Amino acid sequence: MSSTGKFELLCLENPLLDIQGTGDEKLLQKYGLKPNDAILAEKQHMDLYQELMEKHDAKLIAGGAAQNTARGAQYCLPPDSVIYIGCVGKDEHAKTLEKANKEAGLKTCYRYDEEQPTGRCGVVITGHNR
């Protein structure tokens, strides 16, 4: 993880892949969710991610507060001004995050976990509710 560049901003946090799909009250009830709420996913919520992608026209969006901040800052600052550090799984979701950061010109240093998947955030959009 050595770098020859001089970065003005370091962002460090767990990266997330936001999986945003349009659902309804029935989907919320299936997983014990409420509109406009946020929870830490438990075992009974794990199938939601795949269901959003397969049945609810999900969009995959690079997320996580620090990673979003890093991409936004890199947009405003000169090239190679921002570096982001986080941990992801060795999976396709990590590749999605890497691609988004590369497109934003963001230098990214990920640690790859062989056992745990990349962090995900399931978002069920119902009308104006998230």
Residue ranges and their predicted role:
Residues E13, G86-V88, T126:
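Short beta-strand/turn micro-motifs composed of small residues
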Residues G86, K90, A94-E103:
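Short, electropositive alpha-helical surface patch
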Residues C109-D113, C121-R130:
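Conserved phosphate-binding/catalytic loop of the ribokinase/pfkB sugar-kinase fold
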Residues I83-G86, C109-Y110:
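Short catalytic-loop micro-motif centered on adjacent basic/acidic residues
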Residues A100-P117:
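A glycine-rich helix N-cap at a beta->alpha junction
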